[in-house]
Structure formats: C-alpha cells, structure tokens
C-alpha cells in the first residue's frame, strides 16, 4: 500500500512540474505581451521564451532575476534602461516580472 502511495505521489509531482504548461496563466500571458509589445523589452534583452536574442541589455536567461528585482528595475530603470512606471500599470509591471522570472527559471 505504501508503495502505491509513493508512486501516486511521484506521478502527481511529474504532472505538476512537467506536463502542465507554464503558459497557462493569465499573468504569464499579459507579461509576455508587455515584454514583446508594450515595453518592447525584447529590443534589448535576450529571453528564450520570447524568442529575443539582443546583446544590448543583460541576458535574462543567464542572470535569472527574481520577481522583485524585475519589478524594481522595470518601474525605476537602471543604468541606460529607462523607468516604465509612467508607461505601465502596476499590474503590467507585476505581470512582466512574473513572465521574466518564470521563463528565465525554465
């Protein structure tokens, strides 16, 4: 019986981590749209999920920033990157942070 429970648990974990698509949530979709179309982050940043391969800004796949770092950087800017707090809503900033964090982590 314990062996069956263990196998059941392994199957559930496998389904959650490998079979459920990352892109299924609305925040992810909004963040991807902001990344590609509204803030046009792909102009400067490399992110595999977005199909962007720019060399101007940091490669987000390599640095894998956490959500708070992305939110802060998008809102306030850093270095030559402009601030977007006047162009994006708080929801869009959170969504693009979620998208970058989720995509770069995979």
Task: Describe the predicted segments one by one.
Residues 39:
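Cys/His-enriched microdomains
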Residues 28, 63, 67, 86-93:
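Solvent-exposed, acidic/flexible segments
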Residues 43, 84-85:
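Surface-exposed patches in mature extracellular/periplasmic domains of secreted proteins
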Residues 1-25, 106:
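N-terminal export/targeting leaders of redox proteins
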Residues 16-36, 69:
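Electrostatic cytochrome c docking/interface patches
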Residues 32-33, 42-78:
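Gly/Gly-Pro-rich "capping" loops immediately C-terminal to redox-active cysteine motifs
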Residues 87-106:
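C-terminal capping alpha-helices of c-type cytochrome domains
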């Amino acid at each position: 019986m314990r062996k069956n429970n263990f196998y059941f648990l392994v199957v559930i974990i496998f389904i959650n981590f490998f079979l459920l698509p990352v892109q299924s949530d609305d925040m992810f979709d909004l963040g991807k749209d902001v990344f590609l179309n509204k803030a046009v982050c792909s102009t400067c940043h490399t992110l595999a999920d977005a199909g962007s391969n720019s060399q101007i800004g940091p490669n987000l796949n390599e640095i894998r920033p956490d959500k708070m770092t992305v939110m802060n950087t998008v809102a306030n800017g850093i270095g030559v990157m402009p601030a977007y707090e006047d162009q994006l809503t708080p929801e869009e900033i959170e969504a693009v942070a979620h998208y970058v964090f989720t995509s770069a982590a995979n």
